[in-house]
UniProtKB/Swiss-Prot annotation:
GO biological process: calcium ion transmembrane transport; intracellular calcium ion homeostasis
Organism: Bacillus subtilis (strain 168)
Transmembrane regions: 4-24, 25-45, 59-79, 86-106, 130-150, 156-176, 205-225, 241-261, 282-302, 303-323, 331-351
Upper taxonomic lineage: Bacteria, Bacillati, Bacillota, Bacilli, Bacillales
Record's subunit section: Homotrimer.
Protein name per its UniProtKB record: Ca(2+)/H(+) antiporter ChaA
Induction and repression of expression: Transcriptionally regulated by the forespore-specific sigma factor, SigG, and the general stress response regulator, SigB.
Annotated Gene Ontology cellular component terms: plasma membrane
């Protein structure tokens, strides 16, 4: 897999530069940009993981929290700069649906084909359930309900206030998990496994890779955003479909692959943490940061989703909680999550 990503980066980065300079067709550029970003995201993930192991569990957890969805954040910032707030909100929706239904579904399904029953930490599952309900059902639904009788300025002020609260609670959740209650709910062999882990790269190499990959992703993301309109017209895609399906998958593809591989190796704690942890990071950190950053762009972005987006996200949260709160999984539960994702994808495609 690493060799494939290396080839994609080695070919994709030059092609991205040449294609943008020579003004290749938008559809070709769109495909090249997407594949290259996916490959670069894998390098960012591996560099972050190496730095996390070297820095220790607490700093490592903070690094993962900061860079875990860096690609999604970068793409969204450039989309905000272009005033594409609909695509940004849709990509946030897509990340939630993709992580809770597609990634968790594939992880449960692929792992379940090899193992009849897989277990993961039930305490983490229940702790994350509460945060999911807060982040999606409370923090995302309330702005929609209250904004009905509000003007644009009031909507933005409400969204900024909610965003600040969400970031503070996310920091508190990290402090709870990494400091005050670290290891309290972990199985006895978790610490031993963690101690045996070796970084793939040295600190210097990982830092250089992370820095270089971030710069290149930023460059390609800016060009990718410029292809959205023409690609949407050419293929008949709506802004919702581009954001919910395309941008969300491109921004998280490398992380998605990692979760599925972990499930196949029966490391379900890691697979579930990637799926649910990434969802919480998107909802409680990336979305609020984008709302706050939007006030510095010509077009601000209140945290107000469309009704289909809200219904889809709430449904995904409730389904994931119902399936994961028992602390075990099987292939049929994975198939159920995947079926829900396909139904929602069809709905967004037809909107």
């Amino acid at each position: 897999m690493n060799r494939i990503f290396f080839i994609l980066v080695a070919a994709g980065v030059p092609l991205s530069v040449i294609g943008s300079l020579m003004h290749w067709p938008s559809a070709v550029l769109f495909a090249v940009y997407c594949v290259t970003i996916i490959a670069l995201a894998s390098y960012m993930g591996r560099a972050t993981e190496s730095l996390s192991i070297i820095a220790g569990p607490r700093i490592g957890g903070l690094l993962n929290a900061t860079f875990g969805n860096a690609v999604e954040l970068i793409i969204s910032l450039f989309a905000l700069k272009e005033g594409l707030t609909g695509i940004v909100l849709a990509s946030l929706t897509g990340s939630v649906l993709g992580n809770l239904l597609l990634v968790a579904g594939l992880s449960f399904f692929v792992g379940g084909l090899k193992y009849k029953r897989q277990e993961f930490n039930i305490h983490d599952a229940r702790h994350n359930s509460g945060l999911l309900i807060f982040a999606i059902i409370v923090a995302f639904v309330i702005p929609e309900v209250f904004s009905v009788g509000m003007g644009n300025a009031s909507k933005l002020n409400l969204s900024i206030g909610i965003s600040i609260i969400m970031i503070l609670l996310y920091v508190a959740a990290l402090y709870f998990k990494l400091v005050t209650h670290r290891g309290v709910y972990q199985p006895n062999n978790a610490a031993q496994t963690e101690e045996e882990e070796e970084p793939e790269w040295s600190g210097k190499v990982a830092t250089i890779v992370l820095f270089a990959a971030t710069i290149v992703v930023a460059y390609i993301s800016e060009n990718l955003v410029h292809t959205f309109h023409s690609v949407a017209e050419q293929f008949g895609w709506s802004e919702l479909f581009i954001g919910v399906i395309i941008v969300a998958i491109v921004g998280n593809a490398a992380e998605h692959a990692s979760a599925i591989i972990m499930a196949f190796k029966n490391k379900m704690d890691i697979a579930v943490e990637i799926a649910v942890g990434s969802t919480l990071q998107i909802a409680m950190f990336v979305a609020p940061v984008l709302v706050i950053c939007s006030i510095f762009f010509p077009t601000s972005m209140p945290l107000v989703f469309t009704l289909p987006e809200l219904v889809a996200m709430v449904s995904a949260v409730l389904l994931m909680i119902a399936i994961s709160n028992d602390g075990d999984s099987n292939w049929f539960e994975g198939a159920t999550l995947l079926a829900a994702y396909v139904i929602m994808a069809i709905g967004f495609f037809l909107l």
